Design a protein with these regions (language model features):
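Conserved acidic-Pro-Pro-aromatic motif
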Residues: 37-140
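Glycine-rich adenosyl-binding loop in Rossmann-like folds that engage adenosine-containing cofactors
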Residues: 1-37, 41-44, 132
Length: 140
């Protein structure tokens, strides 16, 4: 969907070359943390949370910070995040995700059903990507 790339609360969208000439509309929205959402909706979360998928166009790390209590309590087996060009302007990288998610191994989801590639997030070359999805798998 061509509009989904514009669906972001990132403040630096105009710095991204191919978005520079796009019409960007601003809309006020209400946001909340995952921790608050889980707390307000306890009936929905009686069972253990095993999987969290985050795709917030450049704000995934902030979402993780807002899910810290939920992650600590439920220790999901998998947490999936998306890394894309928005991170060039937010100053965030894969290493910061891995540092926050201690006790998890990092895997890049390879395109075209080519499986998972284990990644060492401390290596600089593993923090350079265009569009990638990563799975953080809880260590045993």
């Amino acid at each position: 969907d061509p509009l989904s790339q514009l669906s972001s609360i990132a403040v630096n969208l105009k710095k991204i070359n191919f978005l520079r000439n796009k019409k960007i509309n601003k809309q006020k929205i209400k946001i909340d943390t995952l921790d608050n959402f889980v707390k307000k909706n306890k009936d929905l979360f009686k069972k253990k949370i095993d999987f969290i998928k985050i795709d917030t166009e450049g704000n995934d790390l902030k979402v993780l910070f807002g899910a810290s209590k939920t992650i600590k309590k439920h220790r999901p087996k998998f947490i999936q995040v998306e890394m894309n060009y928005h991170y060039l302007f937010s100053g965030e990288n894969l290493y910061q995700f891995a540092k926050f998610l201690r006790g998890y191994e990092v895997y890049q989801i390879m395109p075209f059903n080519n499986g998972l590639l284990k990644i060492n997030p401390t290596r600089p070359e593993n923090n350079i990507f265009h569009l990638s999805n990563f799975i953080f798998k809880k260590k045993n």
